[in-house]
Amino acid sequence: MKVLGIDEAGRGPVIGPLVVAGVMIPERKFSILRKMGVKDSKKLTPERRRFLARKIRRIARVFTVKISASDIDRMRERGFNLNEIEKIAIKRIIPEAQPDRVIIDSVDVKPERLEEEIRSHFGEIEVTAEHGADTRYYPVAAASIIAKVERDLEIESIQKKNRKLGDIGSGYPSDPRTREFLESFTYDELPDFVRRSWATVQKKKQ
């Protein structure tokens, strides 16, 4: 049975993309992920995540969807919330992967509602959506690692290309470096990798 795990990185940051990743692997290879030490990306150092991401790519099929800050803003202007935006990415990955079963770290407060939505959209597919799925299912833990590594690489790329603008920090609103970076611009001057629809930034309009 081909099992697809899906997770994301970058829901909360004010800078950079939302990254949704899928990792598809035959069920018989779950033990390989376990032996490799695959677990929830938040419990791993950046170096360990990158090491594991390379190994995951060797034994599994990997899918990523990156939704830029400006695309997030455009979609929010059209009335989409962040959960709906993430679901759009999930629905791009599933048909490309064509799994027998999909396990999702639920974006919906009611996981069963997400399960029903995916089933009705894709027909006869076995769906599991749970909060904290990245701590219980190896393919989802692997997807969380891929998503975090890809998101970190995107942030590094943004920083390198925009070094003259200053230190962007981690991109999270709680990061003092990120806050200082945002404070150096008026709302209209903000670069396109900043999510203007975030409350942190909206305050600048006032």
Swiss-Prot record:
EC number: 3.1.26.4
Subcellular location(s) per record: Cytoplasm
Coiled coil stretches, renumbered: none
One GO term of the biological process aspect: mismatch repair
Disulfide bond residue pairs: none
GO MF annotation: an example: RNA-DNA hybrid ribonuclease activity
Family annotation (CDD domains): RNase_HII_archaea_like
Chain residues that bind a divalent metal cation: D7, E8, D105
Catalyses which reaction(s): Endonucleolytic cleavage to 5'-phosphomonoester
GO cellular component: cytoplasm; ribonuclease H2 complex
Record's keyword annotation contains 4Fe-4S: no
Cofactor: Mn(2+); Mg(2+)
Keywords: Cytoplasm, Endonuclease, Hydrolase, Manganese, Metal-binding, Nuclease
Enzyme superclass (EC): hydrolase
Domain RNase H type-2 per the UniProt entry, residue ranges: 1-206
Principal location class: cytoplasm
Cofactor, how bound (note): Manganese or magnesium. Binds 1 divalent metal ion per monomer in the absence of substrate. May bind a second metal ion after substrate binding.
General function of this protein: Endonuclease that specifically degrades the RNA of RNA-DNA hybrids.
HAMAP family registered for this protein in UniProt: RNase_HII_A (MF_00052_A)
UniProt-recorded name of the protein: Ribonuclease HII
Organism: Methanothermobacter thermautotrophicus (strain ATCC 29096 / DSM 1053 / JCM 10044 / NBRC 100330 / Delta H)
